[in-house]
Amino acid sequence: AAAQEAMAGLAEAAPELAAEAAGAIAEAAPELAGFVAAGVAEGNPEVAAEAALALADANPDAAAQIAASVANANPEFAAEVTAAMAEANPEATADMAAAVAQFAPGAAEAVAAELISNDPGAAAELSSAMAEANPAAAGAIAAAVMDVAPEAAAESAAAMAEANPAAAALAAETMAEAEPGVAAEMAAAMMEAAPEAAAGIAAGVAAGAPDAAAEIAVSMAEANPEAAAAVAGGMASAANGAAGDIIAAMAEANPEGIDAIA
């Protein structure tokens, strides 16, 4: 706490010295890296990225801690700082993103959007790492994917569900609400990756795209007939006003499974 307060004062009074001082402290006392990063972000966020880079350069193993500390101290600058650190150390990007999701979830969407827009091909990997670290941030992560890399929605959704089935419902709801047209494809990909999360996926899709719930329920049940009952239950719980239509559509598509579905 003392190191954080001291760095905040230094960054505000003499910003040109912040990065050099941060690097020196990280070399002498690596356990203080997170506090130093947070202090700079609080005192003068304009130099937070430069200081974070100096800290990570002096202590690469603390990259995730540094990114999370900055995001916690000043969420508004989290995306800029994390992106700069990721550019300097690409191999630590997923760890940094996961740390932000876990310890500074309020900055998760902005950080995910910035990192994924810089490297759309990494959308699934980053989504997976962040959702595994904090399933409660899955909605924010999914929103970021839909905003900057919608073409990666299905792959990212599946990666999140596989990494942490508890993230499935929030991710499915957010993506289905943003683009109902991809809901069926996304739900099928998630079901394939994490069949044990069928009920959560179905509930999320129904909450996000209630008008398409019956149609999507049928496609989900066709993709995995053994999960039909879980799909029906999840859909009905989230869109109970449409439960009759959902069950009727599923029963019509799979008459032999009517008992389990009902």
Question: Where on the chain are the PLM-derived regions?
Answer:
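General marker for long, soluble alpha-helical cores
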Residues: A1-A262
